[in-house]
């Protein structure tokens, strides 16, 4: 079986972890990891918001799936657009890793204690708009590159800190580099942050059945709510967007955020309901955000206004 993935250190680590679990479950299975270069890997010097963001890191991998070049794709769920190409499916959703963002800084242990004017790097509009709301006195620096490249900027003193996803840091075994795990109450994660997606062709039902041992039902419900939220806002929405769903017992709570491209406006909402209503809850949260000012932000986006 051929498994398609990006070639970054994090993507390969994630894919090897999945491959190891598959090999443990099916010792006789022959596995081959196929590295596929994506548009996001090629266009490294352009801010993600300017080149479309969603889908940039998976398009070529999905094309390989559809062409039969690979049988299974391993993605970060947060890179997946709200709508999948016809003929593809999310075959399995493993248990979620830490969904939080983290601060890695050479000058301070906590975000609240950073000095005014500190230079903090991030490659995400979602993070930028929330950071500016939290600490408008900081200088937020746009940042591209792989995880190790971003962290190196701090070590080289080019930046006072970077904010990145905890999941990638943990999967790489770099948790000791973290100076603060930022609570989701302060910074909402991206849709699907911390979750891996195992994508296959819809026709490969036997393969989907074989991946069932990797499925985590709670994570699937949480991600289903988050992706319903994203879908209602518009799958290709380039506004800063965040959503995080948490299941506790039979209750599913989902919090969401939408911001403006100029990073000066941020709207947040929260709702909860039955775990059986994941899609409805995500959709309803998006509706509330749209009614609370998000629709105006989308209209400004269509008109070319910041």
UniProtKB/Swiss-Prot annotation:
| Misc. comment | The porphobilinogen subunits are added to the dipyrromethane group.
Its name, as the record gives it, is Porphobilinogen deaminase
Catalysed transformations (reactions): 4 porphobilinogen + H2O = hydroxymethylbilane + 4 NH4(+)
- What organism is this sequence from? Syntrophus aciditrophicus (strain SB)
Its family? Answer: Belongs to the HMBS family.
Principal EC category: transferase
- Identify the gene encoding this protein: hemC
Task: Alphabetically list the UniProt keywords.
Answer: Porphyrin biosynthesis, Transferase
Phylogenetic placement of the source organism: Bacteria, Pseudomonadati, Thermodesulfobacteriota, Syntrophia, Syntrophales
InterPro entries recorded: HemC, Porphobilin_deaminase_N, Porphobilinogen_deaminase_C, Porphobilinogen_deaminase_C_sf
